[in-house]
Amino acid sequence: MKKILNLLPIFTFFIFYRFYDIFIASKSLIFISGLTCLLYWIIYKEIDKINLFSFITIAIFGSLTIIFHNSQFIKWKITIIYMIFSVILFISQFFMKKPIIQRFLEKDIKISDLYWKKINFFWALFFLFCSILNIYVALCLPEKIWVNFKVFGLSFLMFLSILITSIYINFKMLKEK
């Protein structure tokens, strides 16, 4: 159920963009993101920090897109989110005792600290790469291509990175046994 709730805003944005325009799609994105947070609260009695952060950035950048009738605001949203994630991961990599990914997952996944650092660094680079790639696509290519890239391209890259990380973790867990 959580996966469906997480995908609902992006696919709603895509559908409304296809039938209308980026401004109607931005309105729908704000509404569905807020509704998703409300459903999280009703079903799970909590809203996780990432979903709340996502809703706040969607509300801010979506509203700016609508108010100023300028699609650049919504296009920059994912770049800023991914850049923030990258910075947080890099900071945890170099200035904290444990990388942030390790803090979230070490209860369920038992691998050495060295491997956690590699995974954390991989994800920091991944988010940096995606934020730069989004800037390029948003600024240099037509809006329709950016929407497809945001919905399908970034989703595919995320899926691929999760798959690579999962394979790496499984390999390292087997190696350490």
Swiss-Prot record:
Major place of residence: membrane
GO cellular component: plasma membrane
UniProt KW keywords: Cell inner membrane, Cell membrane, Membrane, Transmembrane, Transmembrane helix
Spans traversing the lipid bilayer: 22-42, 50-70, 76-96, 121-141, 151-171
A Pfam family it matches: IspA
InterPro entries, per database record: YciB (IPR006008)
Domain of life assignment: Bacteria
Topology of this chain in the membrane: Multi-pass membrane protein
Location within or outside the cell: Cell inner membrane
Entry's family note: Belongs to the YciB family.
Function: Plays a role in cell envelope biogenesis, maintenance of cell envelope integrity and membrane homeostasis.
HAMAP family (UniProt xref): YciB
The protein's name: Inner membrane-spanning protein YciB
Protein source organism: Buchnera aphidicola subsp. Schizaphis graminum (strain Sg)
Lineage: Bacteria, Pseudomonadati, Pseudomonadota, Gammaproteobacteria, Enterobacterales
